[in-house]
């Protein structure tokens, strides 16, 4: 009798194993749903350098639950624009290719660089890393281009220069001209230095030496203070500013004059 019972148990065990094997994806998805259902996206306050310009390329009003690749791109934009150093969201069950699309977007260096050009220099990244979990959790970790001390020093410098230039009552065009002349008068174009700060506004406004990205970051900080819509344009070896002035987008390249 015991032998028969053992045989039955063995047969049942084999049947259970076969059932699990044949339905492993469904079972895995079930437990994944249990884990994800208990998770909520945490939305923190944006920092003081969030841009609120109405860029047509990106959507500010999102709920951080993606259903398309464009939704994923907008999440990356808002994470950077808000100045968040880390953020987690989840791929919904209905969006079957979500994790693949996240991987595609997160690994697209050209796209990430383009998004970087639309946010304040203070919210731009030096490095951005995406981690994809089997529970459909997506983590974004941002290493900022500017640390907190550099931001403090530069923000104080920009405020001081604005006061010294006495531009409060000037038109936007006149403000830009004043800042343009100030940066060119106080920055030397330096492509020979090994100092990485030459690629930043710190190099231009504090050290007095910069390359194109340093010039453009410096100008962008002033434009943001004046609430003048702007972004950066970048190619493989050059960066300059694009400024919205008098209902037109205008190119502003300080480096061309800085090099002369």
Predicted segments — roles?
Residues 149, 207-210, 232:
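Alpha-helix capping and helix-loop boundary segments enriched in small/acidic/polar residues
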Residues 148-204:
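Secondary-structure boundary elements
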Residues 214-260:
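Hydrophobic/aromatic-rich core segments of domains that either
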């Amino acid at each position: 009798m015991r032998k028969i019972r053992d045989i039955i148990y063995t047969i049942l065990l084999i049947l259970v194993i076969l059932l699990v094997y044949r339905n492993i994806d469904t079972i895995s998805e079930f437990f994944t749903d249990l884990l994800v259902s208990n998770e909520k996206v945490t939305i923190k306050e944006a920092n003081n350098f969030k841009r609120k310009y109405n860029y047509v390329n990106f959507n500010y009003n999102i709920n951080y639950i993606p259903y398309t690749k464009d939704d994923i791109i907008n999440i990356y934009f808002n994470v950077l624009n808000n100045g968040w150093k880390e953020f987690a969201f989840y791929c919904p069950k209905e969006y079957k290719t979500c994790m693949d699309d996240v991987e595609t977007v997160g690994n697209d260096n050209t796209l990430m660089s383009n998004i970087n050009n639309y946010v304040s220099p203070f919210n731009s990244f030096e490095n951005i890393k995406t981690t994809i979990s089997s529970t459909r959790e997506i983590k974004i970790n941002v290493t900022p281009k500017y640390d907190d001390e550099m931001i403090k020093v530069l923000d104080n410098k920009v405020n001081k220069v604005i006061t010294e230039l006495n531009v409060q009552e000037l038109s936007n065009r006149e403000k830009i001209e004043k800042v343009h002349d100030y940066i060119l008068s106080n920055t030397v174009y330096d492509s020979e230095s090994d100092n990485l700060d030459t690629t930043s506004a710190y190099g231009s406004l504090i050290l007095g030496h910069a390359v194109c990205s340093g010039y453009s970051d410096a100008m962008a900080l002033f434009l943001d203070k004046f609430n003048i819509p702007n972004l950066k344009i970048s190619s493989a070896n050059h960066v300059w500013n694009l400024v919205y002035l008098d209902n037109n987008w205008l190119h502003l390249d300080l480096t061309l004059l800085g090099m002369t």
